[in-house]
């Protein structure tokens, strides 16, 4: 954004912060209707779960707070913590370590080319969540789904 606006990263960050204050996002309207059902299912089966977002931690926490999703996740990781971000696998490898799970035993659900690539580079099973509004590359995904509930069948294949 800084490069696009031809300003310093600090000024771009200040613009971004002010924009989010002036125009807050209602994340409950963006939450997929089937998301809570899948999270409940996975939690009931005892799977450790995490959020590994390349976004800012404060924004990620805001999303989780608004949608009342904190209770499902054991770990919340932000890309701000790392030198490299997606598509670099560091964020996913760190998250697996925090969960005490081997990367090859992890399933990543992603909705972006960068995230899919990061999961692939981390050696994880990658589920690409297709969205007709966005055309992104799913070629590195292990599976491609249109609905999160499809993941229920996939976890038994892994």
Question: Which residues fall in each region the model found?
Answer:
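Conserved phosphate-coupling serine/threonine residues in phosphotransfer and NTP-handling enzymes
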Residues: 53-55
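Hydrophobic beta-strand core positions in alpha/beta domains
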Residues: 50-51, 128
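A short, conserved alpha-helical patch in the ABC ATPase nucleotide-binding domain
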Residues: 1-2, 64
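A generic structural signal for short
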Residues: 26-27, 48-49, 80, 104
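Metal-dependent phosphoesterase signature
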Residues: 2-37, 45-47
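Asp-based, Mg2+/Mn2+-dependent phosphohydrolase catalytic module
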Residues: 40-43, 57-158
């Amino acid at each position: 954004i800084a490069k696009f606006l031809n300003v310093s990263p600090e000024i771009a960050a200040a613009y971004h912060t002010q924009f989010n204050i002036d125009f807050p996002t209602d994340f409950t309207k963006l939450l997929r209707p089937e998301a809570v059902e899948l999270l409940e299912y996975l939690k009931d089966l005892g799977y450790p779960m995490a959020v590994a977002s390349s976004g800012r931690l404060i924004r990620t926490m805001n999303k989780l707070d608004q949608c009342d999703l904190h209770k499902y996740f054991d770990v919340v990781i932000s890309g701000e913590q790392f030198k490299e971000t997606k598509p670099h696998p560091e964020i996913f490898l760190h998250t697996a370590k925090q969960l005490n799970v081997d990367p090859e035993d992890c399933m990543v659900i992603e909705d972006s080319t960068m995230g899919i690539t990061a999961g692939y580079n981390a050696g994880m099973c990658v589920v690409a969540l297709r969205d007709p509004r966005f055309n992104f590359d799913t070629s590195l995904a292990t599976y491609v789904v249109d609905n999160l509930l499809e993941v229920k069948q996939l976890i038994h294949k892994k």
